């Protein structure tokens, strides 16, 4: 019963203290706090010190002061616990021992000054209670009038909790001693001497929050990270060492390879059997031998340009084989030692020479057999062919006069761009319209028009020079394909719009009208011809034809429209042409007097003698665009000139056949002045001049697109083009009228 009363009294006092210092109340807090206080107090002192302290307190205050001593002990225990909160587990014992020494030395007021146990008001109340307890202790300690706890009961109660608390404290200290906090241990003295600025509640929460983060795990994580870094450094070092070793091995291999290559190269220079040209020739020879074994049907399917390429390579190899004995003789005379040519090399040279001669003859025979299977009638040549470089090839064994470097450069276009379909002697083109293996770009005219070109056959001329290849195999060369595009004005006016070439006088051919082609036309033809020569090295060549037909066929090939070629012929007066001529340009200029904005369908209708494609259509449209550009430039020029002259009204502006503007336009579109300009064109020109005048007067020329409004007005003023312009011979009819 006394034990129960003492426990209840201590529990109530503890609750009061917790309320005073602001600690939140929880269930079972009083008993747990009391047990913790007693265990902490007695664990800090050895048994001897504990008994001496208790005896000293009992002797000093006597039996009447037991409650006061117990209160002070509890107060000190509470202060011990509050003071130990901020410190780690490894320093709890040292702190308790230090507090015990301070107590024995009479430094008890330090606990009150620390502010850890209670506030000033609480200490004052306890002093009053302690003073009154000397007179009537039961009234102060036990409000219910119950007796106090005896010394024996207190010792027994403390001994019960001492062992359990001591074991727990030792276990905590043992677990936390593995990772001591150096920073907190260095600041112990500062925390003891200086008053704490935080409350015990905040200190307690901070301590619990720190305990939730085990330092042992942090240290192990740091150790793991450092171990991984060290492992990566080691791996990097090993990889670097392996790379250096591999580089050393690579350098050694390169040195060995260079030594072997140098020795092999020196042997090749001495023997002359493994040069680069010979290796290439062996590959070409193997391909040629494979092609010889094929059947005639397989040969017909191949591109004839391949045979010529192989033949040219074989000829070059034959030249090398012929020069080998000379080099061998020079080597023997120079060395007379073990570096001379071996018997195997001689045998290889002889065998190679024989195989080359055999392969060359077989290739030539195969080409002749394939392209002479269908005899045809040769088309008569109207324009004399150009000259051919001498001695293109030499096949027979007796003639070994090969090209020098300068001769090869002179016939660059003919060698690089071979003519695989040169006509053979006594071999003529097929008279039917059936397509052969290689479709020519310019096909002969229909049989119904043979009589029209009969008189022109007398103008056919044989080539001035004949190559050894032609003399050996019976070839007759056709028109030489020049490696560069022919000038546009180099060919005569063989179009159906003009007269025959024989009727053109020197004056007509050299007149400014005949040379009046725009820069777009010339550049277009030049670009097409160059593109054709660079992208079609093995394309079929033309039969004997005029230079005009050659140039036009190049444009046709560039445009990519190679269908229905049987309808195209530059020799017929009624057949379609492949390109535009100067007469077409003159016709377009005359049509500009009637229409300024022709459509593509109109162009196809009035240029019915031209085989239309994408290039032809765009060129005609470009012509009319240039016509309009010149037309509008002149109109703006004379409109500004009229404004400068003081003209203020459009009524003063008029165009007659005597005015300067009309003469400028007529000189550009009708240079020969052999065509009568229609009156409608004068009206349109006058309207255009006035539109420019009004726009400039109104200040609209500030806008960059101010001419668009004028263009919309002029495009509606086009008139019908006369039907005579649909005729291919419209220029002759118009000029004769």
Curated annotation (Swiss-Prot):
It is found in: Nucleus. Residues 1-28 are annotated as: Interaction with RORG. Pfam families: HPD. The keyword Transit peptide does not apply. Residues 723-729 are annotated as: Essential for nuclear localization, interaction with RORG, repression of RORG transcriptional activator activity. Residues 213-223 have a biased composition (Low complexity). The keyword Metal-binding does not apply. Residues 636-735 form the Prospero domain. One of its GO terms (cellular component) is cytoplasm. Residues 577-735 are annotated as: Homeo-Prospero. Keywords: Biological rhythms, Developmental protein, DNA-binding, Homeobox, Isopeptide bond, Nucleus, Phosphoprotein, Repressor, Transcription, Transcription regulation, Ubl conjugation. It comes from the Eukaryota. The modification Phosphoserine is found at residues 177, 179, 199, 291, 295, 511, 514, 557. Most actively expressed in the developing lens. Detected also in embryonic brain, lung, liver and kidney. In adult, it is more abundant in heart and liver than in brain, skeletal muscle, kidney and pancreas. GO terms for molecular function: DNA binding; DNA binding domain binding; DNA-binding transcription activator activity, RNA polymerase II-specific; DNA-binding transcription factor activity, RNA polymerase II-specific; DNA-binding transcription repressor activity, RNA polymerase II-specific; LBD domain binding; nuclear receptor binding; RNA polymerase II cis-regulatory region sequence-specific DNA binding. Residues 103-149, 178-242, 320-344, 445-476 are annotated as: Disordered. There is a cross-link at residue 324 (Glycyl lysine isopeptide (Lys-Gly) (interchain with G-Cter in SUMO2)). Residues 227-242, 320-337 have a biased composition (Basic and acidic residues). The Prospero-type homeodomain and the adjacent Prospero domain act as a single structural unit, the Homeo-Prospero domain. The Prospero-type homeodomain is essential for repression of RORG transcriptional activator activity. Transcription factor involved in developmental processes such as cell fate determination, gene transcriptional regulation and progenitor cell regulation in a number of organs. Plays a critical role in embryonic development and functions as a key regulatory protein in neurogenesis and the development of the heart, eye lens, liver, pancreas and the lymphatic system. Involved in the regulation of the circadian rhythm. Belongs to the Prospero homeodomain family. Interacts with RORA and RORG (via AF-2 motif). This is Prospero homeobox protein 1. It comes from Homo sapiens (Human).
């Amino acid at each position: 019963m006394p034990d129960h009363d003492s426990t209840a009294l201590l529990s109530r006092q503890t609750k009061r203290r917790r309320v005073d210092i602001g600690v939140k109340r929880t269930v079972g807090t009083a008993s747990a706090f009391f047990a913790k206080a007693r265990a902490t107090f007695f664990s800090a002192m050895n048994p001897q010190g504990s008994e001496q302290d208790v005896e000293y307190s009992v002797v000093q205050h006597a039996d009447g002061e037991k409650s006061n001593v117990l209160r002070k002990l509890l107060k000190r225990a509470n202060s011990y616990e509050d003071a130990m909160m901020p410190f780690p587990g490894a320093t709890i014992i040292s702190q308790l021992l230090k507090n015990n020494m301070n107590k024995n030395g009479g430094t008890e007021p330090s606990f009150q000054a620390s502010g850890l146990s209670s506030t000033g008001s609480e200490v004052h109340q306890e002093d009053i209670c302690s003073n009154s307890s000397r007179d009537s202790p039961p009234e102060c300690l036990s409000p219910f009038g119950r007796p106090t706890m005896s010394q024996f009961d207190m010792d027994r109660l403390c001994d019960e909790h001492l062992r359990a608390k001591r074991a727990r404290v030792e276990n905590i200290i043992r677990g936390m001693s593995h990772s001591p906090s150096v920073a907190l241990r260095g600041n112990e003295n500062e925390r003891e001497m200086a008053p704490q600025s935080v409350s015990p509640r905040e200190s307690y929460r901070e301590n619990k929050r720190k305990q939730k983060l085990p330092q042992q795990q942090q240290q192990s994580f740091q150790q793991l990270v450092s171990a991984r870094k060290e492992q990566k450094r080691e791996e990097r070092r090993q990889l670097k060492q392996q790379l250096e070793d591999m580089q050393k091995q690579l350098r050694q291999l390169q040195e060995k390879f260079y030594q072997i290559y140098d020795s092999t190269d020196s042997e090749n220079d001495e023997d002359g059997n493994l040069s680069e040209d010979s290796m290439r020739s062996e590959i070409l020879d193997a391909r040629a031998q494979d092609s010889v074994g094929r059947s005639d049907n397989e040969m017909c399917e191949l591109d004839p340009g391949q045979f010529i390429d192989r033949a040219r390579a074989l000829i070059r190899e034959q030249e090398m084989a012929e020069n080998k004995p000379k080099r061998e003789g020079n080597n023997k005379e120079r060395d007379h030692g073990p570096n001379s040519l071996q018997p195997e090399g001689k045998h290889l040279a002889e065998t190679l020479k024989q195989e080359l001669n055999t392969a060359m003859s077989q290739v030539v025979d195969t080409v002749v057999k394939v392209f002479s299977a269908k005899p045809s009638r040769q088309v008569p040549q109207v324009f004399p062919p150009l000259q051919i470089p001498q001695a293109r090839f030499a096949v027979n064994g007796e003639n070994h006069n090969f090209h020098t470097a300068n001769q090869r450069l002179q016939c660059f276009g003919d060698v690089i761009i071979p003519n695989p379909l040169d006509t053979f002697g006594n071999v003529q083109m097929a008279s039917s319209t059936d397509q052969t293996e290689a479709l020519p770009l310019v096909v002969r005219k229909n049989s119904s028009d043979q009589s029209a070109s009969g008189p022109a056959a007398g103008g056919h001329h044989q080539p001035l020079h004949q190559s050894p290849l032609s003399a050996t195999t019976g070839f007759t060369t056709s028109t030489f394909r020049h490696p560069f595009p022919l000038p546009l004005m180099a060919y005569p006016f063989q179009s159906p719009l003009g007269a025959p070439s024989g009727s053109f006088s020197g004056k007509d051919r050299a007149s400014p009208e005949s040379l009046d082609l725009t820069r777009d036309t010339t550049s277009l033809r030049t670009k097409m011809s160059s593109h054709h020569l660079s992208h079609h090295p093995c394309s079929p060549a033309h039969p004997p034809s005029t230079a005009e037909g050659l140039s036009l066929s190049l444009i046709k090939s560039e445009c990519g429209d190679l269908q229905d070629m049987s309808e195209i012929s530059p020799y017929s007066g009624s057949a379609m042409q492949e390109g535009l001529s100067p007469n077409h340009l003159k016709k377009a200029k005359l049509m500009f007097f009637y229409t300024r904005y022709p459509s593509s369908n109109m162009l196809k209708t009035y240029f019915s003698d031209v085989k239309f494609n994408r290039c032809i259509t765009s060129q005609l449209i470009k012509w009319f665009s240039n016509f309009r550009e010149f037309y509008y430039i002149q109109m703006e020029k004379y409109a500004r000139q009229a404004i400068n002259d003081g003209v203020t009204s459009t009524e003063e502006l008029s165009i007659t056949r005597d005015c300067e503007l009309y003469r400028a336009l007529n000189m550009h579109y009708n240079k020969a002045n052999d065509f009568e300009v229609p009156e409608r064109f004068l009206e349109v020109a006058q309207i255009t001049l006035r539109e420019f005048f009004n726009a400039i007067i109104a200040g609209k020329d500030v806008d960059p697109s101010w001419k668009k409004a004028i263009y919309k007005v002029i495009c509606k003023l086009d008139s019908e083009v006369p039907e005579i312009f649909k005729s291919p011979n419209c220029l002759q009819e118009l000029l004769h009228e």
